[in-house]
């Protein structure tokens, strides 16, 4: 009996991750969820000292793996027939590119901008309030509300720190219902 239990335990450890994502994808099928997506893979951390919001060449950007990861996110939303009400993105190029490759249409939303660097840290509380008010006004009777943003924003808002391209599903009261990791 112990041998069987051991093999069952070992087998469980090697179940593909997508299997564990099924429950999370099913949560999204009826709409009405708030979906936070950390931007897809962009090597490094933070942004260079000469960072300029209007100039992508001064920012940390998606590489080819990040582009593929973004495209995979979009393909999975289609494959699972996930209804999307609106997609909003941070104004950082890596977030906008993630949104564009995954969903096509999106709107910029400054409340989703990173507050990681000293230059923007002072905006953190204001952005959290603006984002909270936006979600409270959102009519959750339709599709899902999608935010493409940064580690620091998801962490500050949900107290969960996602990997690159990870999808975090919450209800309107911002209780985390599930997460989906998308490989790059």
Report the location of each language-model feature.
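Bacterial N-terminal signal peptides
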Residues: 5-14
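Bacterial Sec-dependent signal peptides at the C-terminal "C-region" and cleavage site
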Residues: 14-22
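Active-site-adjacent alpha-helix immediately C-terminal to a catalytic or transition-state-stabilizing loop
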Residues: 16, 135-184
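Active-site-proximal alpha-helix that buttresses catalytic centers in soluble enzyme cores
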Residues: 21-110, 115-119, 160-184
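Short, surface-exposed amphipathic charged segments that create phosphate/polyanion-binding patches used
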Residues: 121-128, 184
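A polyampholytic, Gly/Pro-enriched intrinsically disordered region
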Residues: 126-138
